[in-house]
Amino acid sequence: MSKKPEHTQPVPVVAEGATLGVIGAGVMGQTLLRGLLSGKLIAHDRVWAGDKNPSTCDAASEALGIAVESDYQARVPSADLILLCVKPNDAPAVMAALRNAGLRRETLLISILAGVGTDRLESLLGTENPVVRAMPNTPAVVGEGMTVICRGRYATKADLQRAQAIFEAVGRCIPVDEVHFNAVTALSGSGPGYQFLIMEALADAGVRVGLPRQLALTLVAQTALGSARMVLSTGRHPAALRDDVTTPAGCTIGGLLMLEDGRIRSVLARAVEEATKISAHLGVGPTKISESGGGQRSGD
């Protein structure tokens, strides 16, 4: 399995003299900005952010040392690249605001709006701006994020490379076909939630057999971290790595038997399946999810 990609030459994030804008200065917006600034991919005076919540603007500006404003429209024409980090339901209003603010045709838009495809974004914008869609996850906060990206009909490979450079500032980034985005959202986008629940349950189990809670949490978290690194660094299948620690009549095989009795594989598979169905409807507002749900054609 390949390691985290490294560019031999830095990929320019914005053109000379232009700026990078971030609309939505919440957790993920601030995380991406922090990664770009700390990685020196862009200077503080070349970045601005906007958020409809004044208190969020104040907090983000203080944390990052950049301009963060509720009324950001005047800055839009100077932007060479804009990151969209708002909620999916805010997409129509934000796209209209960008268009009315004088968005330049060549400005690249990178969206992390879950469930909103590139076709939908392009339709809302009503222009031929290049659009890249991304799905990061929350471990980006500690520089260990997993992001997938794809490009819309007007975006180029160079646009995709610029997006990849941004998300590699906070972890790993892989280009994929857009048809996989609902499944990716369910697996890696929601994945930290599954992992935290599993870690919590294992820590509780440690307490049940007599361990102090903090010790149990540390043992579980470090074991999860080390196991993940073994998979990524060795390229070996998890089943082969599991066999290495499973000795005849030992503790591990006994514990695994109980997990299999509890149908852990099918429970996890059903969780991802259900989350995939929900992802398909995130960009269209509240709706009843059909039994046949899930799956989205490329660009929906």
Positions of predicted regions on the chain:
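NAD(P)+-binding Rossmann beta1-loop-alpha1 motif at the extreme N-terminus of oxidoreductases
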Residues: S2-S70, P77, V207-R208, S298
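NAD(P)-dependent Rossmann-like dehydrogenase/reductase catalytic/cofactor-binding core
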Residues: S2-T8, P12-V14, A221-D300
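Rossmann-like NAD(P)(H) cofactor-binding subdomain of soluble oxidoreductases
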Residues: W48, P54-S55, L64, Y72-I149, ...
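Internal alpha-helical scaffold of NAD(P)-dependent oxidoreductase catalytic cores
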Residues: W48, R120-P130, M146-V184, F196-S233, ...
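Short acidic-hydrophobic, aromatic-tinged amphipathic segments that line or gate anion-handling sites
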Residues: A67-Y72, I174-V176
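Short pre-catalytic strand/loop immediately N-terminal to key active-site residues, enriched for Gly-Thr
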Residues: V132, F181-A186, P238-D243
